[in-house]
């Protein structure tokens, strides 16, 4: 089974544009605020963005998918250290003709970004520079956490993008690298770890008011990933 590969990147506090949205949960006797983390998934068409969101949010692989038109999102409520958090995963179109009218909308108030490429298609890997440029060009703060995901690693005989090349790219852009397969049920835990690591990091950040006060005092610190002996990325929870 392919494992998360640790680069030299770090996940850092999101910008003051909004650590998380809030909603009220009335399922309990009293209303409780639930934080919502918006994570967008970006990359070429047919790299498996939709399948990754299905695998994480629903635990399944769709029998049939169609090209995403504009943007779609799925949600999953998770519990981290006793707190319910709603992870909202935005699945974005990879084709230019479907993106133009929606691009500003799905970059707005984003908390984390997942860049996806197909390990069996070198062009999807080389196009990552274009996607990173688009992300940077839409006012996504540089401190918003970003990770790189190589999908379809179950197709071992067709792999065109070697892990060492992808890791070098991830390091150069201060990102963590994960290699996985949305299709292979054995990789479902690996897919979940991508989004859960981001959710854990976002949750670990202090409240906006307290963090902004620290920023004014110059005390905001990076949140670093630790490296375990087996090379896996270690989450804070």
UniProtKB/Swiss-Prot annotation:
Activity control mechanisms: Regulated by guanine nucleotide exchange factors (GEFs) which promote the exchange of bound GDP for free GTP. Regulated by GTPase activating proteins (GAPs) which increase the GTP hydrolysis activity. Inhibited by GDP dissociation inhibitors (GDIs).
EC number per UniProt: 3.6.5.2
Positions contributing to GTP binding: 46-51, 65, 68, 94, 151-152, 154, 182-183
Motif (Switch 2): 92-111
BP term (GO), one: antigen processing and presentation
Pfam annotation, one family: Ras
Modified residues (Cysteine methyl ester): 237
Subcellular location per the Swiss-Prot or TrEMBL entry: Cell membrane
UniProt main location, coarse: membrane
UniProt superkingdom: Eukaryota
GO CC, alphabetical: plasma membrane
GO terms for MF: GTP binding; GTPase activity
Motif (Switch 1): 59-71
InterPro entries on file: P-loop_NTPase, Rab33A/B, Small_GTP-bd, Small_GTPase
CDD domains assigned to the protein according to its UniProt record, in alphabetical order: Rab33B_Rab33A
Keywords: Cell membrane, GTP-binding, Hydrolase, Lipoprotein, Magnesium, Membrane, Metal-binding, Methylation, Nucleotide-binding, Prenylation
Subunit and partners: Interacts with ATG16L1; the interaction is important for autophagosome formation.
Domain writeup: Switch 1, switch 2 and the interswitch regions are characteristic of Rab GTPases and mediate the interactions with Rab downstream effectors. The switch regions undergo conformational changes upon nucleotide binding which drive interaction with specific sets of effector proteins, with most effectors only binding to GTP-bound Rab.
NCBIfam families in the cross-refs: small_GTP
Protein name as annotated: Ras-related protein Rab-33A
Source organism per UniProt: Mus musculus (Mouse)
């Amino acid at each position: 089974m392919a494992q998360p590969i640790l680069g030299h990147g770090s996940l850092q506090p999101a910008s003051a544009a909004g650590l998380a949205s809030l909603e009220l949960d009335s399922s309990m006797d009293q209303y409780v605020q639930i934080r919502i983390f918006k994570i967008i998934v970006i990359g070429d068409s047919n790299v498996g963005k939709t399948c990754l969101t299905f695998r994480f949010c629903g635990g399944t692989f769709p029998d049939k998918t169609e090209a995403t038109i504009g943007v779609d999102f799925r949600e999953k409520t998770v519990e981290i250290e006793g707190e319910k958090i709603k992870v909202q995963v935005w699945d974005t179109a990879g084709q230019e003709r479907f993106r133009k009218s929606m691009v500003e909308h799905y970059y707005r108030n984003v908390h984390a970004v997942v860049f996806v490429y197909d390990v069996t298609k070198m062009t999807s890997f080389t196009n990552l520079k274009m996607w990173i440029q688009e992300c940077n060009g839409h006012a996504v703060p540089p401190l918003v956490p970003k990770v790189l995901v190589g999908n379809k690693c179950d197709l071992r005989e067709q792999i065109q993008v070697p892990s060492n090349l992808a890791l070098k790219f991830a390091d150069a852009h201060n990102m963590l690298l994960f290699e996985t397969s949305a299709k292979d049920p054995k990789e479902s835990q690996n897919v979940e770890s991508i989004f859960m690591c981001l959710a854990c990091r976002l949750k670990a950040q202090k409240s906006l008011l307290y963090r902004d006060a620290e920023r004014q005092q110059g005390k905001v610190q990076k949140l670093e990933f630790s490296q375990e002996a087996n090379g896996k990325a270690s989450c804070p929870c």
